[in-house]
Amino acid sequence: DFIMQNMKMQCNVISNAYSHGVKKLLFLGSTCIYPKDAPQPMKEDVLLTSPLEYTNEEYAIAKIAGLKMCESYNLQYGTNYIAVMPTNLYGPNDNFHLENSHVMPAMMRKIYLAKLIHEGDWKSIEVDMNKRPINPTDKLRAIIGEGNVDGNNDHERILKALEFYGIYNNKVVLWGTGKPLREFLWSEDMADASVHVLLN
């Protein structure tokens, strides 16, 4: 369903833009369209040269189709449908949940919580945990038992849950090899850049 929903959304937007006389459109893609093992720093011409990251493949395929659809409309109908591929975005209203956030908000929250633990600021930790409780995975449940982890839990249970995600007293553990290059872009800067692209 995921690939179908993404394809339908962008096909509807792009085709209806053309049928309603829209001459200029900005299509937001994603850097996941590039191959999993693309050389770093990444260049645009590596698109479709080797396999995609399997965990993002459906989304990437839909985004590639949208990019190619814009290209085809431009060639066939003379439209100015622009596809841009923003890098890793972060900003206001981001997802900071430890289970499923992207890399930047995950790092920010981990560092923030490690600092609070170091300072012994349990009031702020409880506020944070109530705002974004942890719904334990099977592995975490084996360590802390059943039930969500929120600010109403005892300190020991909260600390065990946070340690599971690599959050300690004034220290965080980040997963991965540290070799991949990443670029981050503030979402409001991306919004400004999008307006600039559309107006120029």
Regions found by a protein language model. Give the residues of each.
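Short-chain dehydrogenase/reductase
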Residues: I3-M7, V46, P51, T55-L67, ...
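Conserved Rossmann-fold NAD(P)-dependent oxidoreductase catalytic core, especially the SDR/UDP-sugar
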Residues: M4, C11-E57, I82, N95
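Active-site Tyr-X1-5-Lys
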Residues: S15, Y54-T87, V103-D121
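Active-site pre-Tyr helix/loop in NAD(P)-dependent dehydrogenases
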Residues: S30-T31, D45, L67, P86-N93, ...
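Alpha-helical substrate-binding/gating segment
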Residues: L75, L89, P105-L174, R182-N200
